[in-house]
A protein has these predicted regions:
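A short amphipathic helical element positioned immediately N-terminal to and/or at the very start
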Residues: 14-25
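Mid-to-C-terminal secondary-structure elements
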Residues: 132-145, 158-233
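Short, strongly hydrophobic transmembrane alpha-helices
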Residues: 24-54, 64
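Short, Lys/Arg-enriched N-terminal segments with co-localized hydrophobic residues
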Residues: 1-11
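Membrane-proximal extracellular/periplasmic loop immediately following the first transmembrane helix
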Residues: 46-114, 225-233
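Short beta-strand segments
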Residues: 35, 68-70, 106-107, 159, ...
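Short acidic/polar micro-motifs at solvent-exposed secondary-structure junctions
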Residues: 72-82, 106-134, 144-157, 182-184, ...
Length: 233
């Protein structure tokens, strides 16, 4: 039989041989190690990016039941391309016409909320959206404070995401604070909501009320054109 001393000597010889081989071709081995490390790093980054893209809009509650409304216009018998901008009343009409199939619907607008916000002399350029009173209910966004179904029916009301509210007011209670929309009109903070991630098509750090009565005054909120409203059901 082979004693332990012999086995130990054989192990040491093997280790010594491996070490000599590595030192003999250390340049080649270093290149292999670096290449392997870079390959693993790129693979991790690639898979992370794929996971990020594949999880778009999964931040919304019941995202698999949330749909964006698209419109296709026909002019003089010719069908135009599908577009994600709709006439103002479309989402509401779908909601009213299919009460058993549609639980909620909302109308939004970007350009009505495209100008900066100001609190005092400080400017805030975070992305914003104008939306009606069913926005949070339809999208399934967590509301932290406030009653958006009631509040967003009124003009000149704004809801802030948690991070933006903290940036603006620090540790102060944001409710009731008045901020300026590009020094054109004052907006009163009535509520806050949970931050939305970057991988969403509806990125908004602030939501400005979009009651139909106000939309009619500033834009074409009718069935006759005015197709500038992304909508969801």
């Amino acid at each position: 039989s082979i004693d332990r001393k012999t086995i130990k000597n054989n192990d040491m010889q093997s280790f010594h041989y491996i070490l000599r081989s590595l030192l003999h071709s250390k340049g080649s081995n270093l290149l292999k190690v670096v290449s392997l490390g870079l390959g693993l790093t790129m693979s991790i980054l690639l898979f992370s990016r794929v996971a990020f893209e594949q999880s778009y809009d999964t931040c919304f509650k019941d995202y698999d039941r949330l749909y964006q409304v698209w419109t296709q216009f026909t002019i003089n018998g010719e069908k135009l391309d599908w577009q994600q901008q709709n006439s103002g009343p479309v989402a509401g009409a779908i909601f009213e016409s299919f009460p058993e199939q549609v639980e909620s619907a909302t109308c939004t607008n970007r350009w009505m909320a495209s100008d900066p916000l100001y609190y005092g002399n400080t400017r805030f350029d975070e992305p914003k959206i104008a939306a009606d009173s069913l926005f949070f209910q339809t999208m399934g966004i967590e509301v932290l404070t406030g009653n958006p179904v009631q509040d967003l029916q009124q003009p000149n009301v704004i809801y802030l995401c948690e991070t933006l509210a903290r940036r603006m007011f620090g540790g102060e209670d944001p409710i009731g604070k008045v901020i300026s929309y590009n020094y054109q009109r004052d907006l009163t903070v009535r509520g806050t909501y949970a931050d939305l991630p970057d991988n969403t098509t509806v990125k908004a750090d602030a939501v400005i009320s979009l009651p139909p009565s106000w939309a009619v005054e500033v834009s074409n909120y009718s069935w006759d054109g005015g197709d500038s409203y992304p909508q969801y059901i």
